[in-house]
């Protein structure tokens, strides 16, 4: 549920979002478009962060997760490898657990993106495709986006033609090249935008990116971390002559890489190291197609319509796996775990339909925005393996099937005297699982989930606002959890009768806004959010079905492979600060999270350490120059046992330990941007920077291995308009 927000700036509660009284806007004054009616981030009754095109360009990110790393409470999990990254919000999200992907909802232009596979990440894309990322932290977003969003929601927005076409231009070509020194990373990008009068515009973009394996601060090369990818976006927007917009878009990402580490993500070190699984050739293709129509019908309080149909398809083909020569290979005697190292194909295909309308009403001292919506999603999971003898068979640890969800939701935003905002909401969602014929099981599963919320925001004056909220959501068991019948050389029963995971989240906080504080025209915003998330009936692997010996017949258990085993709590505080003046700016984000298994009192290994992110920069407006320093100050893990340079065995680990260990570290970066607004270089843009200036050796707590050492970055682009 969303938090109750405190806002310091003038909280205009009209159909128009609140705005700064100054021309300059801080990152906390950016418009939030995914939490209901549009409003600025600091006025939103939920913890929300927004990344825009300027931030993406300045970061010169290689992978999408890099643009999120300064957000409080938001991390990437898995690794810095192209095939090994997924997301973590407030301690929720870990790619080595099949159920973690469903606890965070990820959308691209509204299309659902979901992928889960053993030892592989969950999101495959390129930051060059996007102009904006909205991260809504906490389960409040379940009302609008789907039950079970225990961690939150991440919305990616792709670029549009009108982002590049200036007034009077009918067409534009933008070429961009980038280089980074760790190691020999290259990007080539081209964007073509064309306007067809007042009727339509078209954008076509293509990107090619490659890199050798990167090195860490101490000079260690991370094996098979190199990559070669290409991606593209085509988007046609049609205008009906009034306010209606029909968009048709197609996005494609492709990477065909040889000799990649089989284990792209971490977890239990069952083989002594994550590289103990050997290498494999992987071809990953991700496709997204969206058709949407939006019309605000200005002047008609009964209509503000949004319609969408989308298709998402992610496939992974694995061939030529080395396994562990002489021990575990495709030629092994038993299906599991030897099938891991046979040629195999995995995939998820998701069709979605969504309709949403907002009804406005108002009186002398109140306004009301009632949003009603319907969402339907049909997801198909595929997986098959070709054994050494050439026989094609199903995968017991990656069962095929269909997952169908049908939901209705409403959210009402009631505003009194432009000061008090109350936002109740509820979602009713029906769920059906059906096993594929290859599973040998016929029993389906049906259930119903309820996701209610209530949020309150009160603006005391132009400086101070208070907010608070309560949200409940429920996560359905996944196909993997219900129909898996095999693991690490084990055979077990399907897990019928699993209960839904349930989350109850409470948030409260305040926001401060100041203007003309140190000089005329400056602004300062501070937003602080405290939260407590209580999670019940967590689904996990049945401890009574441990992995068997890989060198003998599989161990057979007459027990379900998954059960509701744990209860947990995650609580903490997040602080965001943004200051902007004519010649300098400052942004800060701090997060302190604690997560425990309330049954055993053990620390949760998915909760990242405390972190402070700072950015201090200068501006030369007439020259179009921005420059500055960024620092990340990350503490040691909450569990002292995991404060280590190497793997250790702590509570809840296998006998070999896990990749969940790290030490405290500080990382320093510098950046420079040049975007002249006039003169002979008007259409040129330069970005340069140095990441990890001091070549520090460090490891992110939620990653497999150490991160990148010192990296010099530069990109140059030029736009040609006509």
Regions found by a protein language model. Name each.
Residues 223-225, 243-302, 314-324, 332-333, ...:
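Flexible loop and strand-edge segments within Gram-negative outer membrane beta-barrel domains
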Residues 65, 69-111:
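Extracytoplasmic beta-strand/coil segments of soluble accessory domains associated
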Residues 179-210, 219-260, 283-296, 364, ...:
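Transmembrane beta-barrel wall of Gram-negative outer-membrane proteins
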Residues 173, 177, 204, 302-322, ...:
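Membrane-embedded beta-barrel scaffold of Gram-negative outer-membrane proteins
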Residues 241, 367-369, 375, 399-533:
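Structural signature of Gram-negative outer-membrane beta-barrels, strongest in the C-terminal barrel
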């Amino acid at each position: 549920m969303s938090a109750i927000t405190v806002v310091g700036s003038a909280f205009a509660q009209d159909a128009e979002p609140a705005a700064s009284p100054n021309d300059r806007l801080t990152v906390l004054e950016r418009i939030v478009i995914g939490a209901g009616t549009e409003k600025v981030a600091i006025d939103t009754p939920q913890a929300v962060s927004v990344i825009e095109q300027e931030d993406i360009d300045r970061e010169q990110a290689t992978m999408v997760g890099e643009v999120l790393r300064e957000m409080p409470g938001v991390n990437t999990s898995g690794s810095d490898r192209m095939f090994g990254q997924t997301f973590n919000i407030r301690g929720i999200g870990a790619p080595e657990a099949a159920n973690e992907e469903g606890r965070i909802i990820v959308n691209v232009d509204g299309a659902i993106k979901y992928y889960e596979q053993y030892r592989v990440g969950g999101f495959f894309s390129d930051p060059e495709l996007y102009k904006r990322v909205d991260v809504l932290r906490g389960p409040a977003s379940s009302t609008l986006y789907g039950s079970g969003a225990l961690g939150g929601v991440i919305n990616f927005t792709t670029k549009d033609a009108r982002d590049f076409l200036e007034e009077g231009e009918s067409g534009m070509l933008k070429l961009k090249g980038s280089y980074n020194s760790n190691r020999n990373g290259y990007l080539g990008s081209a964007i073509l935008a064309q306007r067809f009068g007042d009727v339509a515009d078209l954008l076509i973009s293509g990107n090619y990116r490659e890199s050798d394996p990167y090195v860490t601060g101490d000079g260690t090369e991370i094996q098979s971390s190199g990559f070669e990818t290409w991606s593209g976006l085509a988007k046609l927007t049609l205008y009906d002559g009034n306010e209606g917009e029909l968009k048709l878009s197609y996005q494609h990402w492709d990477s065909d890489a040889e000799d990649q580490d089989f284990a792209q993500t971490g977890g239990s070190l069952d083989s002594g190291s994550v590289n103990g699984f050997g290498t494999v050739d992987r071809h990953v293709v991700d496709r997204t197609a969206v058709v949407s129509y939006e019309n605000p019908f200005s002047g008609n309080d009964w209509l503000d319509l949004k319609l969408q149909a989308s298709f998402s398809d992610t496939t992974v083909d694995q061939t030529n796996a080395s396994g562990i020569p002489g021990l575990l290979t495709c030629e092994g005697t038993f299906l599991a775990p030897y099938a891991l190292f046979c040629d195999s194909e995995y995939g998820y295909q998701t069709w979605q339909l969504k309709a949403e309308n907002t009804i406005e009403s108002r009186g002398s001292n109140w306004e009301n925005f009632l949003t009603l919506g319907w969402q339907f999603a049909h997801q198909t999971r595929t997986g098959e393996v070709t054994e050494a003898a050439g026989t094609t068979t199903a995968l017991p640890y990656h069962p095929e099937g269909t997952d169908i969800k049908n939901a209705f939701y409403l959210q009402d935003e009631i505003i009194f005297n432009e000061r008090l905002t109350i936002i109740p909401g509820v979602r009713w969602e029906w769920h059906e699982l059906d096993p594929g014929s290859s599973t040998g099981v016929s029993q389906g599963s049906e259930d119903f989930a309820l996701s209610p919320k209530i949020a309150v925001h009160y603006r005391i004056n132009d400086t101070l606002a208070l907010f608070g909220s309560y949200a409940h959501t429920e996560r359905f068991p996944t196909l993997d959890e219900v129909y898996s019948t095999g693991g690490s050389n084990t055979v077990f029963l399907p897990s019928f009768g699993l209960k839904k995971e349930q989350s109850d989240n409470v948030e409260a906080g305040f926001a401060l806004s100041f203007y003309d504080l140190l000089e005329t025209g400056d602004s300062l915003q501070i937003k602080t959010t405290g939260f407590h998330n209580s999670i019940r009936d967590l689904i996990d692997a049945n401890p009574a079905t441990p992995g068997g010996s890989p060198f003998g017949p599989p161990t057979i258990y007459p027990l379900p492979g998954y059960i509701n085993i744990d209860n947990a709590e995650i609580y903490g505080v997040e602080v965001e600060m943004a200051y902007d003046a004519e010649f300098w700016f400052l942004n800060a984000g701090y997060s302190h999270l604690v997560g425990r298994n309330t049954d055993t009192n053990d620390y949760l290994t998915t909760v990242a350490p405390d972190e402070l992110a700072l950015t201090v920069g200068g501006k030369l407006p007439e020259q179009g120059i921005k420059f500055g320093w960024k620092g990340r100050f990350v503490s040691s893990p909450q569990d002292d046992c995991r404060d280590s340079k190497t793997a250790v065995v702590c509570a809840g680990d296998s006998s070999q330990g896990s990749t969940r260990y790290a030490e405290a570290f500080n990382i320093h970066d510098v950046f420079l941007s040049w975007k002249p607004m006039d003169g002979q270089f008007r259409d040129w843009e330069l970005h340069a920077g140095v990441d990890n200036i001091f070549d520090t050796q460090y490891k992110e707590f939620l990653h497999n291995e150490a991160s990148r050492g010192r990296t010099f970055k530069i990109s140059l682009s030029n736009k040609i308009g006509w």
